[in-house]
Regions:
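Catalytic core of the metallo-beta-lactamase
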Residues: 1-38, 42-45
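Short N-terminal signal/transit or membrane-insertion segments
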Residues: 1-5, 84, 121-125
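Generic hydrophobic, helix-prone segments enriched in Leu/Val/Ile
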Residues: 26, 36, 77, 97-101, ...
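C-terminal regulatory/interaction regions
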Residues: 87-125
Length: 125
């Protein structure tokens, strides 16, 4: 993935990565291929392997824990998005599937809407 981050070993901290989200819909409009999203997941795996104690997500809703759970959340969201993208006939179906998979997410609805339209080929980005 092309998203740099800083690893601070003395603090066991990851900061500065815009590809880590906390408790909000993930922005996928900039990753329009399965390969790009797979590279993103690989970077998240790389980050998780460091076993950080502190993770400051680049995007998060209020009260999001600043720990490795944000890495796990983002990875699982992307994997769910990939599965639902393949199973959905259009963006409306994809949006509904993601809202069903993540019913508690209230932040980032516009990110989901645009990402679904772009990745289903209904909107140019």
């Amino acid at each position: 993935a092309h998203r740099p981050y800083a690893w601070i070993p003395s603090l066991q901290a990851i900061v500065g990565n815009i590809g880590v989200f906390g408790n909000m819909h993930v922005w996928t409009a900039d990753t329009q291929s399965a390969a790009e999203r797979a590279a993103w997941v690989a970077q998240l795996d790389e980050m998780a392997a460091l076993k950080p104690a502190l993770v400051v997500p680049g995007h998060m809703s209020a009260a999001t824990p600043v720990d490795a759970s944000a890495i796990t959340f983002t990875k699982e969201y992307l994997q769910t998005f990939e599965k639902q993208l393949a199973a959905s006939s259009d963006s409306a179906q994809l949006i509904a599937a993601m809202k069903n998979a993540y019913p508690k997410l209230t932040s980032g609805a516009m990110s989901l809407d645009i990402g679904a339209k772009v990745n289903k080929g209904e909107m140019k980005w």
